[in-house]
Amino acid sequence: MAVAYYCLSLFLLSTWVALLLQPLQGAWGAPLEPMYPGDYATHEQRAQYETQLRRYINTLTRPRYGKRDEDTAGLPGRQLPPCTSLLVGLMPCAAARS
């Protein structure tokens, strides 16, 4: 029993440490917004900030391709006829016709 308690506590402790040591960006994959250098920054600092800001905006707004590009979301490719039942919303159209 003591060994099981020791293993469980070691597992929980290591999980807690792993969660605390995660990088700020890595968990969700979104980049961090660059820090504004201030009103009295040099031209080089402002140029670097603008470059980082442009990269940040391009990363967040880039088009995504693949499965997310489909508009159907798994629905059939044909148009279904409209339901003329009085019970629309209470039962599916197929059940109302039979």
UniProtKB/Swiss-Prot annotation:
Pfam families: Hormone_3. Its main location: secreted. GO terms for biological process: feeding behavior; neuropeptide signaling pathway. No icosapeptide-like peptide is cleaved from the C-terminal. One of its GO terms (cellular component) is cytoplasm. The keyword Secreted applies. Residues 1-29 form the signal peptide. One of its GO terms (molecular function) is neuropeptide Y receptor binding. PROSITE patterns: PANCREATIC_HORMONE_1, PANCREATIC_HORMONE_2. The modification Tyrosine amide is found at Y65. Coiled coil: none annotated. InterPro entries: Pancreatic_hormone-like, Pancreatic_hormone-like_CS. Keywords: Amidation, Cleavage on pair of basic residues, Hormone, Secreted, Signal. It is found in: Secreted. Belongs to the NPY family. PANTHER family: NEUROPEPTIDE Y/PANCREATIC HORMONE/PEPTIDE YY, PANCREATIC POLYPEPTIDE PROHORMONE. This is Pancreatic polypeptide prohormone. It comes from Rattus norvegicus.
